[in-house]
Amino acid sequence: MVDNEKSRLPAAQVWIYGLPALALTAVGIPLLLFLVPFYTEEMGLHPEVVGYVLFAVRLLDAVFDPTFGTISDRLRTRWGRRRPWLIIGGAILMVAIWHAFMPPEKVDWVYFLVWMLILYASWTMVIVPYVAWGAELTGNFDERTRIAGIREVFLLVGTVLTAGVPTILKLFGVSGQTATMEAIGIFVLVVLPVSVGLVLWRVPEPPPIASA
């Protein structure tokens, strides 16, 4: 963490840090708006099965957050504590996005369960260290607020863009739940590696504060 509380982080650095939020929120919105009708109406899974799977995964997600947070805090590598999680978790997340958002023509509940588990786990592997990294960039309260605010801007933009995908597709004469999920999936698969790569390249990761 930066010790100088009067220091102001470069604007470019802060905006680059916020970029991954654009893709990360695009993962969450389909789970809330589009996933259930896509898998029930397009893929043919029973609504109760989809509901049970998502309920079970959400229960496990309550374990994922503190688990990955604790491991990330304690991790020590020459690349830092947060970087490895964004790299490994981001790669797994991209594979999960590909399979969950663009599945084969025929799937069963096992396929859905497996890829939902991997999707939620890998998303947590990225988002928890990512948010922690932002808080560690400075010890200044105002700067932390600025960093979080810019991250929220990207979250808001990603939310609006993702929720508006069906409308955007209609402007090009394309419609349907499959097209919507594919468009969002491709968006994440393009934006996530580029934005994470920029963060790894341009945003410093302060060393952890030694405990007394």
State where each predicted segment sits.
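Membrane-embedded alpha-helical bundles of multi-pass transporters/translocases
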Residues: 2-212
